[in-house]
């Protein structure tokens, strides 16, 4: 991995870490409404950029692939935003960032070569996730619901990156991002309508937050991750947000006075160790 890609991934990690803080800061806006405007705004920005600097078109096969990728990305954001509203920042970010575990599982089903140590890391990460959930033993617990959909959001993100790996090999990142975010916004719009949320349920003062979400965590965050997936594996790319729990939880404590849950405090390092092992040995397998 080059220094340039490393710096891009660092910027992406810092950028995506701002999402959970914004969701908490505009608590009056429904989670699904926030998710929609984040995707729609990001798409609009990239389409506007394309007018200034045309970047090409999608091939017929990639048009089909991007529809699926956009649907899964939309489901990811819908689940992640709802997760933040229904559990702690620490739990939501920890469980929402274990996508590398799912990319490994997908690789197994694709019959790709997997290093044995990757399985060890997978087991460790799963155990860590269990520890994070351990404080929410009641099936009626709001935290259990939030934790579960945050975990589901990680699965959707993993599928998105697996699809992105194929699309990005022959598609410019701006072309991919503008279409991906647009399909994702339509997906969230459908989910919001099904849930009875109106995308117009916000105040004029919330618009700057929508623009922030579209620019910082979306374009400087996820869109840069989409750029990197052309050069490194989906597992490596999906591991970048692992820094988010540390950053977001710290800001959650400082800005909202939210104590880091004991389960997340204890299980968080276990999850990170497990995913680190996955990434390290996934890279070894890729080189082989």
Q: For each predicted feature, which ranges?
A:
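Hydrophobic transmembrane alpha-helices of multi-pass small-molecule transport proteins
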Residues: 46, 50, 67, 73, ...
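Specific alpha-helical transmembrane segments that line the substrate/conduction pathway
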Residues: 33-35, 39-43, 81-113, 153, ...
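Specific transmembrane alpha-helical segments of multi-pass solute transporters/efflux pumps
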Residues: 51-91, 96, 131, 214-232
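Juxtamembrane C-cap of transmembrane helices in multi-pass membrane transport proteins
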Residues: 12-29, 41, 78-87, 95, ...
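C-terminal-most transmembrane helix of multi-pass membrane proteins
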Residues: 39, 206, 242-288
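Helix-helix packing/entry segments at the starts of transmembrane helices
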Residues: 6, 37, 92-98, 164-185, ...
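Transmembrane alpha-helical segments that form core, pore/gating elements
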Residues: 13, 43-46, 103-104, 109, ...
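Glycine-/small-residue-enriched transmembrane alpha-helix faces in small-molecule transporters
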Residues: 1-36, 68-71, 75, 79, ...
């Amino acid at each position: 991995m080059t220094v340039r890609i490393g710096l891009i991934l660092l910027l992406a990690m810092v950028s995506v870490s701002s999402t959970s803080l914004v969701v908490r800061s505009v608590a009056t806006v429904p989670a699904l409404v926030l998710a929609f405007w984040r995707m729609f705004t990001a798409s609009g920005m990239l389409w506007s950029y394309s007018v200034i600097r045309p970047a090409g078109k999608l091939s017929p096969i990639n048009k089909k692939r991007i529809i699926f990728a956009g649907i899964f990305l939309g489901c990811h954001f819908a689940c992640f935003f709802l997760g933040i509203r229904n559990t702690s920042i620490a739990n939501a970010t920890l469980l929402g960032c274990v996508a590398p575990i799912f990319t490994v599982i997908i690789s197994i089903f694709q019959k790709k070569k997997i290093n044995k140590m990757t399985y060890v890391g997978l087991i460790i990460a799963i155990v860590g996730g269990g520890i994070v959930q351990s404080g929410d033993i009641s099936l009626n617990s709001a935290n259990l619901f939030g934790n579960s959909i945050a975990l589901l959001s990680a699965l959707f993100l993993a599928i998105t990156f697996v699809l992105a790996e194929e699309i990005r090999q022959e598609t410019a990142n701006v072309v991919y991002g503008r279409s991906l975010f647009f399909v994702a916004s339509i997906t969230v719009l459908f989910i919001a309508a099904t849930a009875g949320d109106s995308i117009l349920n916000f105040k004029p003062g919330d618009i700057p937050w929508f623009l922030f979400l579209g620019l910082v965590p979306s374009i400087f965050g996820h869109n840069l991750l989409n750029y990197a997936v052309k050069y490194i594996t989906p597992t490596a790319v999906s591991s970048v947000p692992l820094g988010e729990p540390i950053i977001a939880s710290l800001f959650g404590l400082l800005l909202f006075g939210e104590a880091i849950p004991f389960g997340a405090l204890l299980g968080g390092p276990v999850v990170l160790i497990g995913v680190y092992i996955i990434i390290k040995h996934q890279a070894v397998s890729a080189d082989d």
